[in-house]
């Protein structure tokens, strides 16, 4: 096992209680000190003594961090290793222990439901899993404090491959409705995080037809509006005034690469394979613009690779794969996962520059050829 992998805590033997490093400090003061330490160091700190272990494995430390404003962004990644969706593993991106750079460290999460054909949304320190092939109305929550799954109120409709997004404390879900029904008032529904209730949202766009009602949709949140795409059509929904506008998909040229884009600080980014370029969408000019200097160092690495972009606390994280040849030289048998950390900066002229701060392999062990990203996103813990 690599030094950067994190085995379950139950496999680690806690040291015999010895004279405490800070013997007489009250618990609240210890919590205040530990809350200022990066969450990524908690697993190591929990081995120092039993008292640290007790505090760092309880929910109290995270409640203290949240109330005191010491939360930080942690990037969670879920990879699926089969077409059935039954074999998937969770990882967290963190800095290496003994060298510079990053690694995807495995997270021990038991009884994890299949995420295949579901929509995943991060809300604070929680990750919502919505819909799916089996029990399509179900909603589950991964508590990133305890890494335990909880159940949430079910949706009103069963949905297979829906799309969801968070807007002003509410989760909006569209599409994926089961065939054999058509009801524009149920194509979209919204979950209020405060009241924990689901309500339907009537779609008033003439773009919604019987055929598109069952299509898989993709949602993007830009400028407080929900951009919803399916097939070759799209609509824009503004929840503030409950208005719907039509959108031509060719206008944004997103038919093929929609699944690999991300929104960072209200700007939409996408990777264009033919040009091996990262671009951002200028909503005022309604055109794509290149991320200046963003891909210069990475061109030779991402050619013929599968690329995924994600927001990581205002920076862009780019994952891509690299095939590993078999020993006999007759093809490939494994893949390696690589990652780049890209800082973003907007100039006075309105252009956006990208600076590659680091790139390298992030999984110490190779992964199967057949894999897919089920989820990549930041949570606050």
Curated annotation (Swiss-Prot):
Mind telling me which Pfam families this protein's record contains?
Answer: F-box, Kelch_FKB95
PROSITE patterns named among the record's database cross-references: FBOX
Q: Which domain of life is it from?
A: Eukaryota
Q: Does the keyword Isomerase apply?
A: no
Q: Name the UniProt key words of this record, in alphabetical order.
A: Kelch repeat, Repeat
Asked if Repeat is a keyword of the record, the answer is yes
The Kelch repeats lie at 126-169, 171-218, 220-266, 269-314
Sequence ranges assigned to domain F-box in this UniProt record: 19-65
Per its record, how is this protein called by name?
Putative F-box/kelch-repeat protein At1g60570
């Amino acid at each position: 096992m690599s030094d950067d992998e994190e085995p379950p805590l139950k496999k680690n033997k806690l040291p015999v209680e010895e004279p405490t490093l800070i013997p007489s400090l009250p618990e609240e003061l210890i919590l205040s000190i530990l809350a200022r330490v990066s969450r990524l160091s908690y697993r190591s700190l929990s081995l120092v003594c039993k008292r640290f272990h007790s505090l760092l494995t309880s929910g109290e430390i995270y409640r203290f961090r949240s109330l005191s404003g010491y939360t930080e962004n942690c990037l969670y990644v879920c990879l699926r290793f089969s077409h059935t969706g039954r074999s998937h593993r969770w990882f967290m991106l963190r800095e290496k222990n003994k060298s510079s750079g990053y690694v995807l460290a495995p997270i021990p999460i038991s009884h994890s439901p299949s995420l295949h054909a579901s929509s995943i949304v991060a809300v604070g320190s929680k990750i919502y899993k919505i819909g799916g092939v089996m029990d399509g109305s179900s909603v589950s929550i991964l508590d990133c404090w305890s890494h335990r799954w909880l159940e949430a109120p079910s949706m009103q409709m069963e949905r297979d491959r829906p799309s969801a997004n968070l807007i002003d404390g509410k989760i909006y879900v569209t599409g994926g409705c089961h065939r054999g029904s058509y009801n524009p008032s149920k194509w979209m529904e919204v979950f209020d995080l405060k009241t924990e209730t689901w309500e339907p949202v009537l779609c008033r766009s003439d773009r919604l037809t019987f055929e598109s009602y069952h299509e898989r949709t993709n949602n993007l949140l830009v400028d407080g509006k929900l951009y919803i795409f399916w097939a070759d059509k799209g609509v824009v929904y503004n929840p503030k005034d409950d208005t719907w506008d039509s959108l031509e998909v060719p206008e944004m040229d997103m038919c093929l690469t929609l699944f690999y884009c991300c929104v960072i600080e209200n700007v939409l980014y996408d990777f264009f394979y033919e040009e091996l370029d990262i671009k951002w969408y200028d909503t005022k000019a309604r055109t794509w613009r290149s991320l200046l200097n963003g891909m210069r160092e990475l061109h030779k690495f991402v050619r013929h690779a599968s690329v995924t972009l994600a927001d990581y606390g205002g920076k862009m994280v780019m994952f891509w794969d690299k095939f590993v040849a078999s020993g006999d030289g007759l093809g490939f048998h494994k893949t390696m996962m690589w990652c780049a950390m890209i800082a973003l900066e907007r100039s006075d002229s309105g252009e956006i520059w990208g600076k590659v701060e680091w790139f390298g392999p992030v999984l110490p062990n190779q992964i199967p050829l057949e894999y897919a990203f089920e989820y990549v996103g930041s949570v606050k813990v």
